[in-house]
Regions:
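A generic "structured core" feature
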Residues: 63, 133-135, 139, 151, ...
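Arg/Lys-rich RNA-binding interfaces used to dock onto structured RNA substrates
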Residues: 50, 66-69
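Short, T/G/N/S-enriched strand-turn elements that build extracellular solenoid repeat scaffolds
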Residues: 53, 76-78, 168
Length: 211
């Protein structure tokens, strides 16, 4: 089995063993990042074209602010209306799959890459990856880290500075290091924000503004 196939299958692999396909992907990754991060700040169109040409899947109306960093890029899938703010890092030695309407605040890091606990085996330059899956309608606060193998459900808020080491269920607010569920997002919470939104739209109508 080639080292790339081992890597993408969450098996131990060695980056020191020659694998032409993996090396070609790494080269293309560098070219992609050079182009992406050299765009002008307001050139959203070019950045969208670049990620559509390199990510595994991209839904409608994505927006990623530069700088952006990744291990490969071609193992990343993002759904509709995906937004990543400044300095997002995705280490995608295994697949990263993100749903619709997901917001990443500045300095969010999503890691699929891992190293053996054994120092002896680490010294042999063996590594592994575990996929990360994020559902729909998720907001991840700034400076948060999503660790290898984590699954985050849908309709979730992750508080700033969280270190997510275990799965997070749907419909909750979670935060901390390690990240834990704080409370459920219940009907009362939904009603509170609906009332705030209704007030906002009422103000727009009074001002003669339509969206």
């Amino acid at each position: 089995m080639k080292q790339y196939d081992r890597m993408i299958s969450s098996l131990l692999y060695s980056w020191k063993i020659k694998d032409e396909y993996r090396e070609e992907l790494s080269k293309k990754r560098g070219e992609f990042l050079d182009k992406f991060n050299s765009t002008s700040y307001n050139d959203f169109k070019t950045r969208e074209e670049l990620i559509r040409g390199w990510f595994k899947y991209v839904g409608k109306n994505p927006c990623i602010n530069k700088p952006f960093h990744c291990d490969y890029g071609c193992h990343i899938s993002v759904g509709d209306y995906f937004f990543a703010n400044f300095n997002c890092t995705m280490l995608d030695v295994a697949p990263i799959t993100i749903g619709n309407h997901v917001f990443l605040a500045p300095n969010v890091a999503i890691y699929t890459a891992g190293h053996p606990i054994s120092a002896k085996i680490r010294q042999e330059d063996l590594e592994y990856g575990k996929p990360v899956v994020i559902g729909d309608d998720v907001w991840i606060g700034g400076n948060s880290v999503i660790n290898p193998g984590v699954r985050i459900g849908s309709n979730v808020v992750i508080g700033s500075g969280s270190v997510v080491t275990k799965d997070i269920p749907s419909g909750v607010i979670a935060a901390g290091n390690p990240c834990r569920v704080i409370r459920k997002i219940d009907a009362k919470e939904e009603q509170k924000w609906q009332e705030k939104a209704d007030e906002f739209y009422d103000d727009l109508r009074k001002e003669g503004i339509s969206l």
